């Protein structure tokens, strides 16, 4: 499953309680989470990774780590925002979030939903990973209090799982049956066609495979990998571009 937006949908299906998408807030929580993933995240990263923040973030890492990171971001084709512009935007977004959490414990009520988690992670990065830049948060104490409530949710239980372990599991497993959802054709590309899917806003590398599902919300490609065997790769429709393979 590619993209956290789709992964959240899958988690909601596997574990419906507690809800990520409250029934009366499904639309607005998705829209807010999409804004946080793109706009808020972009402003926060551009703010945090200006020279002072980048120097602190990469301090103590092996020589060449910062340059490798810059080259990786450049290859992804992400647009660079001037630090002053990012700072102004980030401050504005923090004030907007403060307005929301002054009325409720969480963004849309008494319990956190997908919107809270989407908004929290770039702010968490500012506070925990680049603390030399975290002074921007002090102007919005309501946001800091909300962040404390989010942190109190805990981190769950993590287990180390290497890339090779994941490949081994995939090689020994079969793809799950596809959901019984209607084929929604927006491109004039029939099922069974060789296609590529590419992220709309970052990362130029296409994923190629056979289109085996195109529902209202996602695409599924069948691929055969020499190491992982037969796999199904799922993408959300929003944010990804479907094309016939050349």
Where on the chain are the PLM-derived regions?
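Mixed-charge, Lys/Arg-rich low-complexity intrinsically disordered regions
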Residues: 155-191
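GST-like fold's C-terminal all-alpha helical module
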Residues: 36-152
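Short gly/pro-enriched beta-turn/loop segments at secondary-structure junctions
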Residues: 112-114, 189-192
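GST-like domain detector, emphasizing the conserved glutathione-binding G-site
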Residues: 1-64, 74-76, 82, 189, ...
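Short, hydrophobic secondary-structure boundary micro-motifs
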Residues: 20-23, 108-110, 159
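Histidine- and/or cysteine-centered catalytic micro-motif in compact active-site loops
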Residues: 111, 122, 163-166, 200
């Amino acid at each position: 499953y590619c993209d956290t937006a789709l992964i959240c949908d899958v988690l909601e299906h596997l574990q419906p309680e507690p809800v990520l998408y409250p029934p009366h807030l499904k639309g607005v929580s998705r829209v807010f989470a999409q804004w946080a993933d793109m706009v808020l995240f972009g402003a926060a990263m551009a703010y945090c990774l200006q020279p002072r923040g980048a120097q602190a973030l990469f301090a103590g890492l092996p020589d060449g780590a910062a340059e490798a990171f810059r080259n990786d971001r450049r290859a992804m084709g992400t647009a660079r925002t001037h630090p002053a512009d990012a700072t102004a935007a980030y401050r504005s977004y923090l004030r907007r979030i403060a307005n929301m959490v002054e009325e409720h414990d969480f963004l849309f009520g008494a319990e956190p939903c997908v919107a809270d988690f989407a908004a929290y992670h770039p702010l968490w990065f500012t506070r925990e990973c680049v603390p030399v830049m975290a002074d921007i948060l002090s102007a919005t104490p309501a946001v800091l209090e909300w962040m404390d409530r989010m942190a109190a949710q805990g981190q769950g239980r993590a287990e180390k799982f290497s890339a090779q372990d994941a490949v081994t599991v995939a090689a020994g497993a079969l793809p799950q049956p596809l959901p019984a959802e209607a084929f929604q054709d927006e491109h004039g590309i029939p099922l069974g066609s060789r296609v590529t899917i590419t992220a709309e806003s970052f990362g130029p590398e296409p994923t190629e495979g056979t289109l085996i599902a195109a529902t209202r919300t996602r695409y599924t490609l069948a691929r055969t990998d020499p190491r992982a065997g037969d796999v199904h790769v799922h993408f959300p429709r929003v944010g990804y571009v479907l094309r016939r393979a050349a």
